[in-house]
Amino acid sequence: DLMKFYKACAADGIYASQGGPWYPFFQSQGYSTTGGAPKGGELILYHTQDPKDLEFQYIGEWDAFREYCQEMKDLVDAGAWSSDVLNSSDERQTGLLTGRTASMSWNLGTCLTYGKQANEEHPDWNVTMVDPNKNLSKKVNSYINNGVAINANSKNKERAMMVLNEFYTNPDVYDLAMLGIEGKHWEAVGDDQYKVIDESGYGVASNCNWGWNNCTIQREEYLENRTALDDKYESIKDAFNNNIKEDHVYDGFNFDSSNVSTQFAAVEAAIDNYYNPLINGLVDDVDASIDAMNAAMDSAGIQDILDEMNRQAAEYVAEKEEK
């Protein structure tokens, strides 16, 4: 459906987005980024929807990646986004808010924020939200994502943990960190809701509280004038929460590149020559470009990285099975 939308936008002479939907695509195939892997985890994926599949997938050898890149080239040739997108300094929301693009991909909360801004400034646009992978169960991030770590050299690790527990479990402290000062930045509505008074100087839910999110005590925002977009956001969020996938052991795995630091640095130095043009369809010949990327990655040492990753993953899985 997303591809049909992009093609329809191009046919109508409007840019569909500010680049290719690489994340929604590999997620639609059941895959996720691998923690600690090159290119922010995007170069090596794992099949998060299948807990029995313990193979890592280097995208250069993935047929689906080749097919995706060809489809992106077809979309660019059709005019689905600018051929100059890699040189643009626009932020991700710029295209939507200025009307230069018909969509924006981001997390739920950010899509709500900019969708509401677009509708307030241009009511006739009727911006809405969709989940392009609504049929897939959802991955829940582990606490190593947006979490807070205690330094291994801390002299009082237990005391540090007590502080974090206070932020995580004390409703008053939780409200302060998330919402700011009651009566200045926000006011309570009942026992479990809040209303924004003034976000200047302290953006609600946009600060350190990401490190100890706790939905059991977190207040929901009270909206006096609900919009269709608010309702859509709630329905998608509820659908997410009611469709959590089974854990994959690699959901908590994080690759340590120390033993292959030279190869890792070489891969990172070379990948941008190929990766960004490919995932945005900005190459003349997809097959030739992927072959060139693979040759560069082989020369940089991608196989050494994969071998070390498989070794660490095997140890990680064995350790988990013992517990």
Where are these regions (language model features)?
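Extracytoplasmic/secretory soluble proteins
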Residues: 1-323
